[in-house]
């Protein structure tokens, strides 16, 4: 059956990390799909940029996620085979902290509940195996061999390329003004045209508040800053020798990844400075107060990586 002009089975607003994946999978199933992205593809707005993203199976936030993560691993491997480029890098992950902290104990609980492979290592054992780690006495780490990272920018591009191959349609630099659910389906008005669809997926990240009124009181964007610091001892921070980590330091959760593409190890702090913002009011300029907590953590707990900051970037 030939579809009517400007009518689709599904319209997806926002072709970032999740929107590109939805476009790919729906087009692969034979649906007529239109993806609308207000920026370039890929772009450095929102939260999709940054070269790499952590992936692990012991999902502490809720053990019910674990079966979904198993499926995600399968899907990433399939996309990697179709694309012919390395996307999924499994060199291990470490969740570290003091033994009485929730992140540490909760991760062990999830691993045990779902029969995931793991080891518990003291701080000195972590340092002996992975010299880039120099955590304090009394800290322990849960090492998961099947954790690692995704080449997130490449993943987004791979999803978009394969969606095109599957017959999907994607428009970059096309801002959506409004949408409405009608008796006959969905109507989407962009700055360029009007489209209709049977279904709508909104994956607009921090811009979703502008499209879904109910989210305005329940989903508040925060300003985040990531840093890349060059190692004094580069071999200790390559992916094969430096597992990705989440670690609680003085009550503050930090995360980090090995040196990949950007000349430096990547480090961030969950919620950073806890600054609520909006896409329109985001202060995109990193400042000394943004850099300081990242450098302090790196210099104290990963001292081989205390060179001058190579890059700071903001996101939502």
Residue ranges of model-derived segments:
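Predominantly flavin-linked oxidoreductase catalytic cores and closely associated redox partners
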Residues: 150-235
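Beta1/beta-strand and adjacent pyrophosphate-binding region of the FAD-binding site
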Residues: 3-16
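Dinucleotide-binding Rossmann-like beta1-alpha1 core, especially the glycine-rich loop
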Residues: 52-129, 254
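Flavin (FAD/FMN) cofactor-binding and adjacent substrate-gating region
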Residues: 78, 98-167, 171-172, 178-184, ...
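N-terminal Rossmann-fold NAD(P) dinucleotide-binding loop
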Residues: 19-20
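Glycine-rich FAD pyrophosphate-binding loop
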Residues: 27-48
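Active-site substrate-recognition segment that forms the wall
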Residues: 23-28, 84-88, 194, 199, ...
């Amino acid at each position: 059956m030939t579809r009517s002009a400007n009518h689709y089975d599904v319209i997806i607003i926002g072709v970032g990390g999740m929107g590109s994946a939805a476009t790919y999978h729906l087009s692969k199933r034979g649906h007529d799909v239109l993806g609308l992205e207000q920026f370039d593809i890929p772009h450095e707005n929102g939260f999709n940029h940054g070269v790499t993203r952590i992936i692990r199976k012991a999902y502490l936030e809720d053990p019910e996620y674990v079966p979904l993560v198993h499926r995600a691993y399968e899907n990433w491997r399939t996309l990697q085979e179709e694309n012919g480029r390395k996307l999924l890098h499994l060199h291990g992950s470490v969740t570290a902290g003091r033994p009485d902290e929730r992140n540490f104990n909760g991760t062990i609980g999830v691993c045990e509940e779902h029969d995931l492979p793991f080891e518990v290592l003291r701080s000195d054992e972590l340092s002996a195996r992975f010299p880039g780690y120099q955590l304090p006495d009394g800290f322990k780490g849960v090492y998961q061999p099947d954790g690692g990272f995704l080449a997130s920018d490449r993943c987004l591009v791979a999803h978009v390329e394969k969606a095109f191959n599957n017959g999907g349609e994607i428009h970059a630099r096309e801002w959506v003004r409004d949408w409405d659910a009608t008796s006959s389906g969905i109507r989407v008005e962009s700055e360029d045209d009007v489209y209709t669809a049977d279904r709508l997926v909104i994956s607009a990240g921090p811009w979703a508040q502008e499209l879904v009124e109910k989210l305005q009181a329940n989903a508040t964007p925060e300003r985040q800053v990531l840093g890349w610091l060059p190692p004094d001892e580069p071999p200790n921070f390559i992916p094969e020798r430096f597992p990705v980590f989440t670690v609680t330091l003085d009550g503050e959760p930090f995360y980090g990844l090995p040196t990949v593409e950007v000349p430096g190890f990547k480090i961030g702090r969950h919620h950073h400075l806890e600054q609520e913002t909006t896409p329109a009011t985001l202060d995109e300029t990193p400042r000394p107060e943004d850099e300081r907590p990242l450098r302090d953590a790196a210099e104290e707990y990963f001292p081989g990586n205390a060179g001058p900051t190579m890059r700071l970037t903001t996101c939502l």
